[in-house]
Each structure stands twice: as C-alpha cells, then as structure tokens.
Amino acid sequence: MKKFLSFIVMCLATVTLAMAQQAKPKTGGPSIKFEKTTHDFGTFSETKSTQKCVFTFTNVGKSPLIINQAIGSCGCTIPTYTKAPIRPGEKGEIKVTYNGRGLYPGHFKKMVTVRTNGDPSMVRLYIEGEMTDAAQDSATKEKK
C-alpha cells in the first residue's frame, strides 16, 4: 500500500511540474503587430447600418507571415484579409464590415479572431459603436 501511495504522489508531482513549464517564445519566425486592435465607429444611424474599418498590421518577424483565417463573432461582422504571405517588414490589412441592418439599435461590440502562423498565433480585434433608431432619427429631423 505504501508503494502504491508513493507511486501516486510521484505521478501527481511529475504532472504538476510538467504543467508548470512555460512555453519558450518563438524566435526567428514571423510575428504580427497591429497598429490598433480596437475601432470605435461612434454613433451612426440605422439608415446607414453598414460601417467599415481597416486594421493594419506589420510582419515584425524574420520569415513570411500567413493569415490562416479571420472569423467574425457573428454574421453581421465580416472580415476580409490579405491572402498572400506578408514578407518581413511589410504591411497587410484586415478589412472589417459591420452590417447592422435588421438588428436592434443600440450599443454593440463585436470581435474578429485572427489566426496566423506567427507569434502570437491568435489576435482578437474589436469593433464597437452605437446604432441609433431610424424612426428616432427622422423624428429629430422633423423637429428642426
């Protein structure tokens, strides 16, 4: 019984130590750096429900950077991105379109998840804004 308990304790200690090891950062590979990771559209009318922005990034690594995918958090957030490999020192873009047509007016915050072959391998970009009700906008115009 003592041997069995000693074996279990040793296994738990080994697993604990193995999980505590930190991953070494990649060196010499591609590395992505965004100029900004959040864009605020501000306030806009429901009648102009489609809004666009561009996130610019640079490959600050030493080998070509590939964007494997960029996925919006919902169907209203549509990213398009540079498909060709980005050489070291060069820039690329991720264009994001928000389409609020048919959605409820108010504040929104959406996310685009970008996956690359570089470091970091995943980056989250955020868009947000305030879409006002079209009926409320027309009532405001009539009062003027």
Task: Give each language-model segment a name.
Residues 1-23:
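Bacterial Sec-dependent N-terminal signal peptides
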Residues 19, 53-59, 96, 110-115:
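Buried hydrophobic-core signal for structured, non-transmembrane domains
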Residues 21-56, 60, 131-144:
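Beta-sheet-dominated interaction scaffolds and their linkers
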Residues 42-49, 85-87, 101-102:
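Short, solvent-exposed beta-strand/turn "edge" segments of beta-rich domains on protein surfaces
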Residues 60-63, 102, 118:
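Short, acidic/polar linear motifs in exposed loop/turn regions
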Residues 62-93:
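Surface-exposed binding patches on compact interaction domains or structured appendages
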Residues 94-102:
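Short, hydrophobic beta-strand segments
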Residues 104-133:
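Terminal connector regions
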